[in-house]
Design a protein with these regions (language model features):
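Short acidic-aromatic low-complexity motifs
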Residues: 1-35
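Alpha-helix N-cap/helix-start motif
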Residues: 22, 49-50, 96
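A beta-strand edge to alpha-helix "cap/lid" segment located at domain peripheries
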Residues: 58-123
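Short histidine/acidic/glycine/proline-rich micro-motifs that form metal-
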Residues: 16-17, 43-46, 90
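Compositionally biased, intrinsically disordered low-complexity segments
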Residues: 6, 20, 47, 72, ...
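Short coil/turn residues that cap or connect secondary-structure elements
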Residues: 21, 41, 91-93
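A solvent-exposed, acidic/Ser-Thr-rich amphipathic alpha-helical stretch
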Residues: 26-74, 78
Length: 123
């Protein structure tokens, strides 16, 4: 597994969460995220392990409504276990965001850390 392949799977996962909150996306969590997964958004820690991710995503989905992910860039770092992804998140209830995220992959090929920054798109 390369970090860029993992980044693409992450964006597909986000797209699925944005489309529906059925159990299909829940099955993807242990395959994509390490048990010690950490999620940070705009400097705020949102999840300190994989088991907290489902609730965090459901809470965001309730507030934001459905959303669509449009991938813009995937840039590998010199370290082969890290990359930057940039995408647009267009939500039904909270508007559109230009998002930049640094993903870190663990030895097992799973996302260990996600540091996201959201910038609202003003149209």
């Amino acid at each position: 597994m390369t970090i860029l392949n993992l980044a693409r799977q992450y964006n597909q996962f986000q797209q699925q969460v944005g489309n529906t909150l059925d159990s299909t996306y829940e099955d993807m969590i242990p395959n994509l995220f390490s048990s010690s997964f950490i999620k940070i958004a705009n400097g705020i820690v949102l999840a300190t392990n994989r088991s907290l991710l489902k609730d965090q995503l459901e809470n965001v989905r309730k507030v934001a409504g459905s959303w669509v992910i449009v991938s813009k860039e995937e840039i590998p770092f010199q370290e082969q276990n890290r990359c930057l992804i940039r995408y647009h998140l267009m939500s039904k209830d909270l508007g559109s965001y230009d998002v930049m995220a640094i993903l870190t992959m663990d030895q097992e090929g799973k996302i260990q850390r996600n540091e996201e920054n959201y910038y609202q798109i003003i149209e």
